[in-house]
Regions:
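Short, solvent-exposed, Trp/other aromatic-anchored flexible loops in extracytoplasmic proteins
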Residues: 65-101
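Solvent-exposed serine/threonine-rich low-complexity stretches and specific carbohydrate-binding patches
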Residues: 54-73, 107-111
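Short, surface-exposed binding/anchoring microloops in extracellular/periplasmic proteins
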Residues: 6-54
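Short linear proline/tyrosine/threonine-rich motifs used for host-factor recruitment
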Residues: 56-60, 69, 93-95, 104, ...
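Hydrophobic beta-strand residues in large extracellular and virion-surface proteins
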Residues: 33-35, 44-46, 80, 91-95, ...
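Extracellular beta-sheet/turn segments enriched in Thr/Pro/Gly and aliphatic residues
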Residues: 2-26, 103-127
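Short structured motifs
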Residues: 17-21, 32, 62-66, 77-79
Length: 127
C-alpha cells in the first residue's frame, strides 16, 4: 500500500474532540503526541526501546509493551503522553498493516526543530 498508515502530530495541533480519542499516559510525561491512523491497522503495540552495544555498533531492542490495542482506526486517534525523547530512541510502536506486514517505528525527535516523528526500524528482541 502507498503511504504510511499513521501520522504523528503534537497534541495541541491535532484538534482532538473531548472523548473522541483513546489515550495512554506515562508517569511524568514531557510531550503529548497524537497518532492519527489514515487507515485501520491491527495488533498495535507501544513499547520501551532499549539498546545493546557491540563493538562500534548500537542495536535497538524491543523491550516491554506499555500499551496494546487490537486495532487503531481513522475515527479513533491515539494520544500518547510520552517521556523525554532522547538522542537514542527510548519508545517505539508497531502494528500490522492492511497487507499483513509487521511495521515497526522508533519515536524520534528532529535535531533541527524538535519535531517528533516516526522512523521505520527493525528491532532486535530484548535478550
Amino acid at each position: 500500500m502507498e503511504g504510511e498508515a499513521l501520522s504523528v502530530l503534537p497534541a495541541e495541533d491535532a484538534g482532538l474532540a473531548e472523548g473522541g480519542y483513546d489515550a495512554y499516559r506515562e508517569a511524568d510525561p514531557m510531550a503529548e503526541i497524537v497518532l492519527l491512523p489514515t487507515r485501520s491497522v491491527t495488533d498495535f503495540h507501544y513499547f520501551i526501546v532499549g539498546f545493546r552495544e557491540g563493538g562500534d555498533q548500537l542495536t535497538l531492542t524491543r523491550e516491554d509493551d506499555l500499551y496494546t490495542a487490537d486495532a487503531l482506526s481513522p475515527d479513533r486517534p491515539l494520544l500518547l503522553a510520552i517521556p523525554f525523547v532522547e538522542t537514542i530512541p527510548n519508545r517505539g510502536i508497531s502494528y500490522v498493516d492492511a497487507d499483513g506486514a509487521l511495521r515497526q517505528y522508533a519515536i524520534v525527535e528532529s535535531g533541527k526543530d524538535g519535531t517528533i516523528f516516526l522512523m521505520e526500524e527493525v528491532f532486535d528482541s530484548a535478550a
